[in-house]
Amino acid sequence: MFIGFDYGTANCSVAVMRDGKPHLLKMENDSTLLPSMLCAPTREAVSEWLYRHHDVPADDDETQALLRRAIRYNREEDIDVTAKSVQFGLSSLAQYIDDPEEVWFVKSPKSFLGASGLKPQQVALFEDLVCAMMLHIRQQAQAQLPEAITQAVIGRPINFQGLGGDEANTQAQGILERAAKRAGFRDVVFQYEPVAAGLDYEATLQEEKRVLVVDIGGGTTDCSLLLMGPQWRSRLDREASLLGHSGCRIGGNDLDIALAFKNLMPLLGMGGETEKGIALPILPWWNAVAINDVPAQSDFYSSANGRLLNDLVRDAREPEKVALLQKVWRQRLSYRLVRSAEECKIALSSVAETRASLPFISNELATLISQRGLESALSQPLTRILEQVQLALDNAQEKPDVIYLTGGSARSPLIKKALAEQLPGIPIAGGDDFGSVTAGLARWAEVVFR
């Protein structure tokens, strides 16, 4: 049996075809979405959990070496890896919030797959993280289906990483493919996420149109200009319908990070001075919220940075504020900070102003954020998104008849307004912002596996 599988940066979902239409399966708490989050007692617990409780093979030298190190470490630290040691989605978030110092938590592992400079052991670790999530998702889907799931079309962005090009894309897709096969999928095919989203929209068209698909996901923005219509449906070879592509590693997570940095970090002393009037360095505050940047997070949570924060508290004109950043370092609160910014971003799609409260840092710590403040904070990532739109159009040398806007950030009035200003007079259509890619992947699975 085949599925469409959106292994997303923000959320994961799965769809099957029923009576000619995509049907999304339940993933968690009666929702079709599973937030892309995972937690365990230690990162080493994930590798042992796969082997001990799910008989997932360690296929090559690096994964075997990782498994041996993991088992040895867990034994030395007296960590008993049980079947419930690894949690996913909102369940993992709840565990992390309950005890951030004792829980190893990762959000959006897909964000890291195309990173340059990854060592073989890091690639092996990310493969295990992805495999664990895919295994869990496959089990959730399998419980709702009568036949064994053996085939999947998995979505992928145009570019996994802003830098690195083909090498980064090859690395990231390789991790996804190996992880999927270890998780039990016999046949794996990849499809570009904006193309998949467009396929779902195409099912509604009665005539051929040039459709600009703008897919703003959690970790990437992908744009494709496509010829779509009844005559293209069910064609296995659609090369002639793909007029132009572009993609970059800017997505909803980057919007959340930018909002946290601009509006929340000043509460924690960013922009302050020493007693001598010297500006405090900005980098520790940026690294604290850059949750999709492995080197930045490693640097922030290093012991060297802990010593730097001690020095900053000692020298700052407002040491009580910098001490709050020190608490983020000590209790590993980066994800909670960015999550608070995300909640404000969502609220500002329907209200003019919202209150950001950070009681997990300090009871009275709060600030008001307006839509104008949001627009100012997001100006740089929004500019990058619009650059990708223009790049796809330049690549195609054609103008769209319609814009199909999708992805988790598609609901933002700021993005719709910016697109309307960039391409005046062109209608903007939308669908299921969180499910269109998955639905399109299921449609493509029916074409390639039928």
Swiss-Prot record:
Keywords: ATP-binding, Chaperone, Nucleotide-binding. PANTHER family: HEAT SHOCK PROTEIN 70KDA. This is Uncharacterized chaperone protein YegD. GO terms for molecular function: ATP binding; ATP hydrolysis activity; ATP-dependent protein folding chaperone; heat shock protein binding; protein folding chaperone. GO terms for biological process: chaperone cofactor-dependent protein refolding; protein refolding. Coiled coil: none annotated. GO terms for cellular component: cytosol. It comes from the Bacteria. Belongs to the heat shock protein 70 family. It comes from Escherichia coli (strain K12).
